[in-house]
């Protein structure tokens, strides 16, 4: 195994990262996850979808959208990032106001640990059952294991979308309007100010 020889494995999703993680040192092994790109299971009753970690994010969203569902995770890199990459970087998306961040969507993870063991880390009933080990992998960028499968909680797709733009005289007025919207408990998926 790589661990027995002291060789670090660097998982590579679709290469949308900007932190230099795709440049392994000569003593490291780059593991291209790009061929692990399949929707493995779609449970429309329980609103769950299991993807291989290398699946393109936009293709994952399109696959569930064909069934009237949504992941609800729309990072700006959605078309060039992978589902496993979202978890590995603890990504946030443009619709996080409405749907949450990636950690809010993860139902379970399948991971290969550094010793080669394949484990599944899933949700457990809320109780004093110990730490939720999924959170160790979220944002770890492959340092604690290689994510091979991700099961995400889905939502029913909105029956319609409405887009609106408004003018504010200055930034302060715009921020005040956004604050009032949030404090009124409205949950627009996206709010931007330019």
Model-derived regions, located:
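Glycine-rich N-terminal segment of FAD-binding domains in flavoprotein oxidoreductases
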Residues: 1-36
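FAD-binding subdomain of flavoenzyme oxidoreductases
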Residues: 38-192
